[in-house]
Amino acid sequence: MKIKKKERQRLLMELLEGNPFMTDEELSAHFGVSIQTIRLDRMEQNIPELRERIKDVAYKQRDSVIALAPEEVFGEIVDLVLEERAISIFDVGPEHVFERSGIARGHHLFAQANSLAVALVNNEFVLTAKASIQFTRPVRVGERVVAKAEMAGKGSGRTRILVTSHVNQEVVFTGEFAMYQQNETEERPQQ
């Protein structure tokens, strides 16, 4: 049964409030209409395209990070629940890859995962004490890396965080990070 335009637009707004990362293609399949119809519906409802929705979510999350200044975060944090989970997005550009092969330099994938692990800890003073990482496939220029971090345990001044990075649902990087955080009774280093 076909949904009327006004009802579809209302449902579209509700759906994107719950999941702002849905593509026009996914929305088209969800509602059983053309991509052009979805784009017209978005325009009529003043709903920005995916890239702008991602930037908006990232902007709203920037003040939640305690240990890093916004410019110190590698990738765009799009979801953050301190001490629970976090998600960031990193678009691989020509400046991130080896010139001859077009393959992303590993330290960029590590930086995305590491800054996500630091951001997840609810403390002003957080350092990576140990990291065990694995690259599972090369990432190429133009690909979007979505890193998901979750807290796996906490104790004795250390927090264990697991990070998995994907490109189009395919795992490209995994890491287990032991994060050190200074407790309130320790003296802070002088700046």
Curated annotation (Swiss-Prot):
UniProt keyword terms in alphabetical order: DNA-binding, Fatty acid biosynthesis, Fatty acid metabolism, Lipid biosynthesis, Lipid metabolism, Repressor, Transcription, Transcription regulation
InterPro entries: HotDog_dom_sf, Thioestr_dom, Transcription_factor_FapR, WH-like_DNA-bd_sf
Superkingdom of origin: Bacteria
Single GO term (MF): DNA-binding transcription factor activity
GO biological process, one term: negative regulation of fatty acid biosynthetic process
UniProt domain MaoC-like: residue ranges: 102-169
HAMAP family, per database record: Transcrip_fact_FapR
Main function: Transcriptional factor involved in regulation of membrane lipid biosynthesis by repressing genes involved in fatty acid and phospholipid metabolism.
Protein family: Belongs to the FapR family.
UniProt name for this protein: Transcription factor FapR
